[in-house]
A protein has these predicted regions:
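Beta-strand elements of repeat-based all-beta scaffolds
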Residues: 1-601
Length: 601
């Protein structure tokens, strides 16, 4: 059996008279239906009355949900010309080097299919699709306020523009806009341009300069340039072997524009071969793409063989360790080596080699770091392919330093040993450092359903226990120095509203002090408030409150001192550093420096 005690795990599946799946049980050890202490140990679904076999209701396990009617309900509707079921009609078309967005008002009633999904806590989402099945609009309701995300297509059915909620709120007129000139689209929209073969050649993300893409005749990405690359006058380039595997990625200084590159590669198939010595500028590969000598390879990858080892003494050769398997000479289809350069100093490179056994498993990885340190990793597997021992060896290149510091040692070995139960679950982890005694890092315990219920750390000095509800949601963490309980909808403290969709209603934390934190959410499942209480239900501080814009960015945080900290982390070009003063439980006040990096156009 698959359970820790060797019992069989039974799964039950239910079907209706039309042979449609309608239910599935949780795993039951030896078929014991009372294992979970809940009569509703299964999930299920209910179909609509139409012949389309559409599911109108799904429910998960748990009496707390089923007895309270807490399921996910789906209604299948058609659009209307007003209200929550209305949908704006957008389309996109090319306009030279620009994409034009055109709004033609609203779709006429009955033109679109609408699915209205209501989760267990009454949160509503509408999805609008056309007769071709293309998703046009996702409308999430925060109470009565819609948050609309539109996907706009061209006449060929290609996705051209995505309008998130703030953009959708601004573009309400029956009009057209150029994506390169509209401030709203530049700030919030996602825009895509294609070539005649339906390949994306330009992508614009909110607030960013466009990313350009160039392909060869085989539709492989050859060049890419984002806004920062353009400012630096470089392109990212890619080279591939005959099987389409990326062999080189690097940067290429060039002022050539995308259109000129497209002409160069339009009829070219860029396929590189490894030919070894004589191609030092390309690390043993040919250069059919004819990139100039000013290019800087950043990652070079080798496959199928180890002929590349002759290119550099920095590649560490195979170390024969019979306990860790035997290598094969030609691991076909496998990544065998890499040269990885530092981005800020490409002259410094790490050389990595991977060795495989006859079952295609990595048994040895050797790396010479940018500083010249030698690192070896050896892996031993059991019959079914699980690692049972991992040995890591580190060798320094500074023996002279040991003369100055005789007590120091710069060569180390760490061995990790793993034990598993009969079902492949890890049960023990051991570590041996250098020649020290082997210690047990962790021991894991599972319940009969296979869930982790306990973890003992460092030879039994630290014991952690975990508990779950019937849906597998974590409900308690019990450790020697703290206890945390997570409440959803069962055994709630007085005054806490139950939540059924997976949001946490209350957290109890006990360490030096004990406290409850009652959590509130908006209609989009965003945390809006956290109120702290003592275990006796007495408020200890004002609630922390959070507000958001329609993009999901935090716009303000109200902290226990009742001071508002304005949050600018996602606003372009406004502010980099925010010092937010606040008091913690009204005991003392401190300033928290919060760093936000501006997005670069």
């Amino acid at each position: 059996g698959a359970s820790p005690q060797g019992k069989d795990l039974h799964f039950t599946f239910g079907y209706d008279i039309l042979d449609r799946p309608v239910g599935e049980s949780l795993p039951l050890p030896d078929g014991n239906r009372n294992y979970y202490g809940d009569a509703y140990y299964y999930s299920g679904c209910v179909y609509g009355n139409s012949s389309l076999n559409r599911i109108r209701e799904t429910y998960g396990p748990g009496a707390a949900w089923i007895e309270n009617g807490k399921s996910v309900k789906t209604e299948y509707l058609i659009n209307a010309d007003s209200g929550e079921l209305s949908c704006a009609e957008f389309r996109a078309e090319d306009n030279g080097e620009d994409v034009r967005l055109i709004r033609s008002g609203l779709y006429a009633a009955g033109e679109l299919s609408v699915a209205r999904t209501t989760d267990e806590d009454g949160k509503v989402v509408y999805t609008f699709t056309d007769f071709e099945g293309k998703l046009l609009l996702t409308r999430r309701m925060n109470g009565t306020e819609p948050h609309d995300t539109y996907i706009v297509y061209d006449d060929r059915g290609r996705k051209r523009i995505v309008l998130p909620p703030l953009a959708a709120d601004e573009l309400t007129a029956t009009a057209s806009w150029g994506c390169n000139s509209s401030e709203v689209i530049k700030k919030y929209g996602y825009v895509y341009r294609y070539d005649g073969r339906d390949r994306v050649i330009e992508k614009k993300l909110p607030g960013c300069d466009p990313v350009h893409f160039v392909y060869d005749r085989s539709d492989r990405l050859i060049l890419k340039q984002n806004g920062n690359n353009r400012k630096d006058g470089v392109w990212q380039y890619y080279q591939y072997d005959g099987l389409g595997r990326e062999v080189i990625w690097g940067v290429l200084p060039s002022s050539t524009g995308r259109e000129d590159w497209e002409v160069i590669f339009r009829d070219t198939v860029c396929c590189e071969r490894f030919i070894g010595l004589g191609q030092d500028g390309n690390f043993g590969y040919t250069n059919t793409a004819a990139f100039n000598e000013s290019r800087t390879p950043l990652i070079v990858s080798y496959y199928d063989s180890y002929a590349f080892e002759a290119l550099s003494d920095s590649f560490l050769t195979y170390v024969d360790k019979p306990d860790f398997g035997k290598r094969i000479e030609r691991p076909s289809g496998k990544l065998t080596g890499q040269v990885i350069a530092l981005l800020n100093n490409p002259e410094l490179k790490e050389h990595v080699t991977h060795y495989y056994d006859n079952r295609g498993r990595v048994i040895q990885t050797n790396a010479c770091s940018v500083s010249g340190f030698h690192n070896y990793s050896f892996t031993k597997y059991d019959f079914i392919g699980q690692p049972i021992s991992v040995r890591k060896e580190h060798y320094s290149i500074y023996p002279a330093k040991a003369i100055l510091e005789p007590e120091a040692t710069y060569d180390h070995t760490i061995v990790y040993d793993y034990e598993y139960d009969h079902a492949g679950r890890v049960t023990r982890l051991y570590q041996t450092f250098d020649k020290n005694e082997r210690i047990k890092i962790a021991e894991y315990r599972y319940d009969e359903a296979g869930r982790l219920v306990g973890k003992v750390l460092h030879d039994g000095k630290f014991d952690c226990k975990y508990d779950y509800n019937i849906r597998g949601w974590l409900t308690e963490i019990d450790e020697p120095f703290m206890n945390e309980k997570i409440y959803y909808n069962e055994d709630l403290p007085e005054g806490v509203e139950p939540l059924y969709n997976g949001n946490i209603a209350d957290v109890y934390y006990s360490a030096h002090d004990s406290a409850h934190f009652r959590l509130s959410y908006d209609g989009l499942n965003r945390l809006t408030a956290s109120q702290q209480y003592t275990r006796d239900g007495v408020k200890t501080a004002a609630a922390e409150a959070f507000t958001y814009d329609k993009m999901g960015n935090i716009t303000s945080i109200e902290l226990p001192s009742s001071q508002n900290a304005q949050y600018f982390g996602y606003q372009l070009g406004i502010r980099d550093l925010l010092i937010a003063p606040f008091s913690i439980l009204d005991r003392y006040t401190r300033s928290i420096p919060t760093l936000y990096k501006r997005l670069t156009k």
